[in-house]
A protein has these predicted regions:
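Short N-terminal or domain-adjacent regulatory/targeting segments
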Residues: 116-144
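C-terminal catalytic/acceptor-binding lobe
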Residues: 2-8, 15-126, 279-282, 288-377
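Acidic, Ser/Thr-rich intrinsically disordered and amphipathic helical segments
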Residues: 12, 17-24, 152, 163-166, ...
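Hydrophobic targeting segments
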Residues: 149-155, 171, 183-185, 204
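Active-site beta-to-alpha loop of glycosyltransferases that engages the nucleotide-sugar donor
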Residues: 143-144, 148, 155-166, 190-192
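Short, well-formed alpha-helical segments that are part of the catalytic scaffolds
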Residues: 132-140, 160-175
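Short beta-strand/loop segment that forms part of the nucleotide-sugar
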Residues: 180-191
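Conserved catalytic core of nucleotide-sugar-dependent glycosyltransferases
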Residues: 6-11, 192, 196-200, 205-209, ...
């Protein structure tokens, strides 16, 4: 009897264990097929979307961009890991970029005294290779600081291509070291009539302002190269005379009222003197007229130290059709009477073309002819 009871008990236990195993097996199968179908569905969607986005998602690594240390199952599709925009979420509290500081009064990269020579051959291609940061039209803006002024450098010009190559070769690096925000404008007088330097400078002022909002204007002859980069090409509280010590004059100022070669005026100063005279045809006199305009309007000429304001001149013969102006002495004596009616307010010219080259902007103009000289009886 006891054996029969024991056998039935064992039979029930075995059936219970078998039933539990069967239940466990069924649960495992259900879970297995559920996960398999989910994975199949996910990979199907992933592969369907992959064909259109292969170039965008070439790898199978996925990350939580807002939580770098979190992990996810490798089978999750990119659409479930990325935000709705389809792009990684960036930190919305991005740091505000620091404002560009003002350029220092004395830039730290200046060299000082320079060796200037004109014996080596020069080409525009070489100058362009040397100045890759100069943009079209001969413009440059310091990348690491904010210049106080925007400077237009204006050169009166005719038949001086050889000199221009050397000028650009030396001046572009100097101006960049000086942290000048500048543009270079070559004002080319067309035709073979008598040259008029001051009128071309007026044209340069007018045309440069059409191109950009300049507040400082440097007027330079194309044959003068500064020998010291501490001679800073920007405007000052008073009209500035830069070329005070040329090799042509033994590195001395030829006379107290000399204002030739290279000079600079702010826009306000330029307008105060009504610009430059338009009636000085031929060589000489216009610089002295400009000096008179400055002093007659209550301003003074500022100059650098004579050891810094040194210049070398590229030697050349006097240009044809730029003979000395025989009327210059009479005109200089009448500056007070003529400066209000002869200047930027009375400027007339015909603009022929504007061409922007890699190293400068060329502006070709027709400025007319000088009036006929009076016949002496």
């Amino acid at each position: 009897m006891s054996r029969l009871m024991l056998g039935r008990t064992l039979e029930r236990i075995c059936k219970a264990v078998l039933l539990l195993c069967l239940v466990h097996f069924l649960i495992m199968m259900i879970l297995y097929f559920d996960v398999y179908s989910q994975r199949f569905d996910i990979f199907s969607r992933f592969n369907n979307g992959r064909g259109a986005n292969t170039s965008r998602w070439p790898h199978h690594s996925y990350y939580n961009y807002s939580r770098p240390n979190a992990t996810f199952p490798s089978y999750l599709p990119a659409s479930e890991l990325l935000p709705p925009s389809g792009k990684p979420e960036l930190n919305r509290s991005q740091p505000t970029p620091k404002p560009i500081p003002p350029c220092p009064e004395v830039p730290p990269g200046l060299v000082g005294r320079l060796l200037i020579e004109f014996s080596s051959l020069m080409s525009m291609e070489r100058v362009q290779r040397e100045n890759p940061n100069v943009t079209e039209g001969g413009k440059y803006t310091p990348p690491d600081c904010r210049a106080k002024q925007k400077v237009a450098i204006i050169i009166p010009f005719r038949h001086r291509e050889h000199h221009l190559k050397y000028w650009l070769h030396y001046l572009h690096p100097i101006l960049r070291r000086q942290k000048i925000d500048y543009g270079i404008y070559i004002i080319n007088q067309l035709g073979e009539d008598t040259f008029n330097r001051a009128k071309l400078l007026n044209v340069g002022y007018t045309e440069a302002l059409k191109d950009a909002e300049y507040d400082c204007f440097i007027f330079s002859d194309v044959d003068l190269i500064p020998m010291d980069d501490r001679n800073l090409y920007h405007c000052y509280d008073q009209p500035r005379h830069f070329a005070i010590a040329m090799d042509k004059f033994g590195f001395r100022l030829p006379y107290a009222g000399y204002f030739g070669g290279v000079s600079g005026l702010s826009k306000k100063q330029f307008l105060k003197i009504n610009g430059f005279p338009n009636e000085y045809w031929g060589w000489g006199g216009e610089d002295d007229d400009i000096y008179n305009r400055i002093t007659l309007n209550g301003m003074k000429v500022s100059r650098p130290d004579v050891r810094i304001g040194r210049y070398r001149m590229i030697k050349h013969e006097r240009d044809e059709h730029n003979e000395p102006n025989p009327q210059r002495f009479n005109k200089i004596q009448n500056t007070k009477n003529t400066m209000r009616k002869d200047g930027i307010s009375s400027l007339t010219y015909r603009l022929v073309s504007i061409k922007k080259y890699p190293l400068y902007t060329n502006i070709s103009v027709a400025i007319g002819k000088p009036p006929p000289r009076p016949i002496r009886g």
